[in-house]
Amino acid sequence: MRKVVVITIASVLAIFAAQTSSHAAPVFDGLWATSKKDCRDKDGPDSKTFIDLDNVIKGKPAPLVDQYENHCRVDRKTPAGDGLVLSTTCFEFWDDYNKGANGRKVTIKLAAGPKDTIRIDGNSYRLCKRKDELPRKR
């Protein structure tokens, strides 16, 4: 009987651990750049890339990858090794993004890197700020 209780408790703990890890925030969410200089908060073209795979707009999931004049709605996420392949529709202007007009299909490959780095389409990016460190209004 004691063995059954121990097995039951171990099983319950394993289930809770699996559920907790499956809800962990994606390592890709946040503000990234290819250099520390590009992490500065300034307007204009640079390598800053904002990734929010849990983004919600008007109560609906709306994951996005946002770069200077390149606003991408994530249509599909496919696991690939230690990363993801994102099938996206990208727009040059926010107005087009909001209207869903003049989009182009783009595939974006994300891969985890060493501490606070990722690779976006093979290029190394460093973490500027985690998503929860950024202002809510973007």
Regions found by a protein language model. Name each.
Residues 28-67, 96-99:
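Short, solvent-exposed loop/hinge segments that bridge or flank secondary-structure elements
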Residues 23-36, 80-86:
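Conserved long hydrophobic alpha-helices within structured protein cores
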Residues 14-22:
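C-terminal segment of classical bacterial N-terminal signal peptides
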Residues 38-42, 71-73, 89-91, 127-129:
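Sequence contexts marking disulfide-bonded cysteines in secreted/extracellular proteins
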Residues 119-138:
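Edge beta-strand at a domain terminus
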Residues 65, 118-119:
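Short aromatic-centered micro-motifs
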Residues 1-9:
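Bacterial N-terminal signal peptides that target proteins for export
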Residues 60-113:
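Contiguous, well-ordered beta-strand patches that form the walls/edges
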